[in-house]
Amino acid sequence: MASLTYDLTLAGLSVGSAAALTGIGLIVTHRATGVLNFAHGAVAMVCAFLLRQFTVEWGWPLALGTAVTLLVVAPAIGVALERLVFRPLAVLGGDPAQTLVASIGVFVLLVGGAALVWGTGARADAPTVVSADPWGQLAVALALAAGVGAVLRSPRGRPLGSRRRTRFATELRAVVDDRPLAVLGGIDADRVAAAGWAFGSFTAGLSGVLLAPYVRLDPYGMPLLVMEVMAVAVAARMRSLPVAVVVALGVAVGQSQLTRLHPAGRAEPLLQAVGANLFVLALLVSALVLPGVGTRDALPRTATARVPTPPGAWIVAVVLFLLPLGFAGSDLHTSVQVPALGVVLLSLVVVTGRGGQISLGQAAYAGLGALFTALLAAGRFPGLPRLPELAALAVAVLLVAPLGVLTGWPAIRRHGLALALATFAVGVGVSRFVFAQPYATSGLSLGRPAGFGGDRAYYVLELGLLTAALLAANALRRGRTGRALAALRDHEPGASAAGVRVPALKLAAFVAGAALAALGGGMLGMGLRAFDATAYDPVRGLLWFAAVVVLGADSVLGALAAAALLVGLDAGARGGVAAVLVGVLAVLVGRFPGGPYEALRTAASHLRLRREVSLTPLGSRVRRRLLPRATPPAARPSPRSGTPSPAAVPAPRSGRGRTAPTAPGSGRSDTTPPGPHIRPGTAPPPSPRTRQGAAPRPSPRTRQGAAASSPPGGRPGAAAASGHRTGTGAVSAPPAGAEPRAPLSMSLRALGLRVAYGGFTALDGVDLDVRPGRVTAVVGPNGAGKSTLFHCLAGTLRPSGGRVLLGGRDITRLPAHARTRLGIARTFQQLAVFPSLTVDENVLVGAEQGRTADPEAAERALRLLGLDGPVRAFPAAGLPTGTLRRVELARALAGSPRVLLLDEPAAGLDTPEVTTLARVLRALAADGTALLVVEHDLDLVADLAHTVHVMVAGRIVASGPADRVLERGYGG
């Protein structure tokens, strides 16, 4: 018994050493570049194949082949990846989630390339670099960990590191944290990143050549095996090398020891599955239970950008999908797979494209759909009778859909890298613990529904199911649900602030995605007449994800094109061509966010000849003489709308001293929206651009007097909302029923709020009362706790002590979206608009998700903020800052809030825009809304606020009327 334990321990140490090397490589790459390298396993596989090629095929000496592979080829792969793929993303400011998509593309590219060069079969003659004695491999792993630890040791601890090493560690950390700032500081960021990638690829190659003699060496199996070992790096929080080594050795030894247990009964297959896949179980635990890695990273906008559909594309798609009805033989049999795979990829359009959630486990749901359909049709599903094939497919979809919670639950608190790991872990777990188990899948065959046994008849059935799936996906992407999903994708905090139930919506997206994937998987299984576990392995899931992303994740047409591309290339070309093509496109997705069509259109626009027309000197003199007599450009009406021509409208300023472009076709200057001071039948005040000179900002005392002179009973907000601009800029009478509804008066109170971060106290017993009909301002220096207080009131931060009351109700534990539905709206210091939605749709999200479901609320908000013109039809992306500030405020007002919280509302606005903003906010207060403003612009505070609170070091040190508090020198 002791001898068996010793032998199993040695076997575990051998596997654990290779796993430790993988963890070390992943951690080093992540610490050096900030990238979680999903291609690590693919690099290991390529190096193992190259060493075999050098020594077995070409007859090189083992020492020479090993040296070339590990010291030349592996680092060269890392440097090439850094130079060609990840450096451009870093220079362009790509976020970690964007580099994640690129690393998945590299994985798919290398796997496909290896399949092209060496074929898809497994090799059993890989050379042994280190003897089977585990002590040699363990020594390699420990020596490598010690060397890396010495290089990466922080400057505070120098016993093992020289000055050069500590300086390199500092430079490495600086490049990862802020590459542009590191470059400005004189650090050679390219050299540091290249060194990190070279070393990471070296460790990947070392892991590959050590594992190759003992595992299955093939283009698909070995990369997946190495990626399963990613659990050790995740458990070490991508930071601690000792933890990674200990976890790797412990899991490997435990996995080896489990092989000695052989219980009787039903527990035996389960225990065997756990014993063979303990690293997979560790990956599931570390990805689903431990705190997420990179939780702040969302899926990049380039991966989910709205892709323009080429003219006539749908007609072409319909024709192409009908063509197989004229095929016969093997061509028709192959075509049967296209509609089924199209349905599977539609699930990614819903989850990733529209919902913005990274999902690498959709292949698992497709496989479960096929497996459950086969079990139900065969009468082998526990507790259910044998069902006809179509009924079995429907029941399988209903059974798999709730399992979408397996990936939807982690998505509630995880984003980007953490969510990618969680969904990938679920996919690997299902593949290993369900699909690979003979007790669940042995002897399964899957027939086709009665009357659809032939390929042509079954293809017709598939087209009907595909049409139903397209309608379902389109319904999820349109209307109220579609707008909420787009808001969640574009800006999750903004969506929550608008009232979107983010957790429930994420779960709904993953459940719908699981249902679609199960439907497609069942169709695919019936088309092939069998359940093939390899058709749903995690590597194929990565390929599907990459294909959908590169062809337009938010495009239904892109999913259909991806299905046709993958099936066509797999059937008509050598294995691996589809993976290579998709991998190349995925690597380039950061540069061409709209997919191949957008890239081709951009290239065509650059190649198109542009003829520039210039006037001669005589023509210039004639123009100068005639120009004063011509009609001013701003007065020319647009031929369609009668509003001033968009090209002639002066560009408004988006910030202090900066001019931003006006949205084309907006029909008005961004600096002169109708303000609440305008009464029906009166002309608006002259634009600052029409005056001889811009008037200076009035003093705080003058502003207070001007504000006080406005009669509170005049309801300026009602006047502003009840009138609308005509084409000439005048304000006409409102349509019937356009009167705004005053919100029910309700105050927001903070009682003894306390927030501490470690040993730092951000809020220390803060009391605050935001009363209806009044503007309350909070000022103070940076770090005083203003933003922390704001987040506690908005619901994005839970205080460690104290309470938040709304009209006497304790809302301290309520999340942001729940507070929005109670009547608390907010804006953000950094703009929180939804770029893929139009101005109208942005505001409509607030009206649909806010406190009251009032269909006219969006229209009133648009009219109040001067957004009811042509600009309402334009996407928010690219609009000037001033316009976007109004869009954000209009969205908040569309929910009919009782309390409005504004965080730096004047950020990025010029003087006329700030003046207009103050008019609107005063009107809202006059209508009974309670306003809280956190602002550094003391002139705006003096002009606007009734009460000012000054915060210093987490406490309110002064309170009172604005003129008295500000004239005493507080606030700055």
Identify the meaning behind each predicted range.
Residues 794:
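Helix-to-loop junction immediately C-terminal to a conserved catalytic motif
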Residues 15-18, 22, 41-44, 91-126, ...:
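Transmembrane alpha-helices and adjacent helix-loop boundaries
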Residues 941-943:
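A short, surface-exposed alpha-helical micro-motif characterized by mixed small hydrophobic
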Residues 802-809, 822:
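Conserved ABC transporter NBD signature motif
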Residues 900-904:
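Catalytic Walker B motif of ABC-type/P-loop ATPase nucleotide-binding domains
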Residues 779-781:
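The feature captures the beta-strand-to-loop junction immediately N-terminal to the Walker
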